[in-house]
């Protein structure tokens, strides 16, 4: 949720019986079933940690179809991540003061399209709902865009299923990648704050 003071916080409940992926805007009592994740511009002092998470996350793809450890171009490059930070594309995902992941995002066509270059969560936090929370935060943070686009390798069964679960539709594929997109609903302003129509 984006408050009028610029604070951005998503409360995503994982309690059984709740609707998966629903953003809870009311205050929730803190317990082990609630994720409090903050999405913010990456800080230079955190680049080494972010790169270590990126490397670990993409290297873990060997468990879901990759032929060997590795990732997209520059996934393990400190210099490239610094460049992405300096250009405003690199965000860090933080829970309880700990960086747990990141996202590299690009606005296109005068802010109408968001291209998700990559998202990544530290493998020690896989299967905890952090990736789902990160994607929901990206969608809420960029709620003014009309379309979100991304791509993922065909061999990666984990990410293809994940994006489909989140409502992304495959629009095409080539020999290496599946290309997905999602159309977002309208946004309106209430008391100077953005709110998404449901």
Language model: regions and residue ranges:
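Conserved acetyl-CoA pyrophosphate-binding loop and the N-cap/start of the following alpha-helix
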Residues: 125, 129-137
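Conserved beta-strand in the GNAT
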Residues: 92, 98-107, 115, 120
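Conserved beta-strand-loop-alpha-helix junction that forms the acyl-donor binding cleft
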Residues: 126, 149-160, 176-177
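Conserved GNAT-fold acetyl-CoA-binding loop/helix
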Residues: 55-80
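Conserved GNAT acetyl-CoA-binding A-motif
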Residues: 135, 142-154
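A short beta-loop-alpha structural element at the N-terminal edge
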Residues: 37-52
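A short helix-loop-beta-strand connector motif used in the catalytic cores of GNAT acetyltransferases and
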Residues: 79-92
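Conserved active-site alpha-helix within GNAT-family acetyltransferase domains
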Residues: 132-133, 154-173
């Amino acid at each position: 949720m984006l408050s009028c003071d610029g604070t951005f916080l998503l409360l995503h409940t994982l309690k059984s019986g709740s609707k998966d992926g629903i953003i809870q805007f009311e205050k929730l009592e803190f317990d082990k079933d609630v994720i409090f994740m903050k999405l913010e511009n990456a800080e230079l002092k955190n680049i080494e940690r972010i790169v270590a998470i990126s490397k670990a996350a993409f290297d873990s793809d060997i468990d879901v179809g990759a032929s060997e450890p590795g990732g997209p171009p520059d996934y393990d490059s400190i210099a490239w991540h610094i460049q992405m930070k300096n250009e405003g594309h690199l965000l860090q995902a933080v829970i309880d003061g700990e960086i747990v992941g990141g996202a590299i995002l690009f606005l296109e066509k005068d802010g109408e399209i968001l291209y998700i270059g990559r998202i990544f969560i530290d493998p020690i936090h896989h299967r905890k709902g952090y990736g789902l929370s990160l994607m929901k935060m990206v969608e809420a943070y960029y709620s003014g865009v009309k379309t979100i686009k991304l791509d993922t390798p065909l061999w990666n069964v984990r990410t293809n299923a994940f994006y489909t679960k989140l409502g992304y539709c495959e629009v095409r594929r080539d020999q290496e990648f599946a290309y997905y997109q999602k159309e977002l609903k309208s946004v309106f302003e209430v008391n100077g704050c953005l709110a998404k129509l449901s």
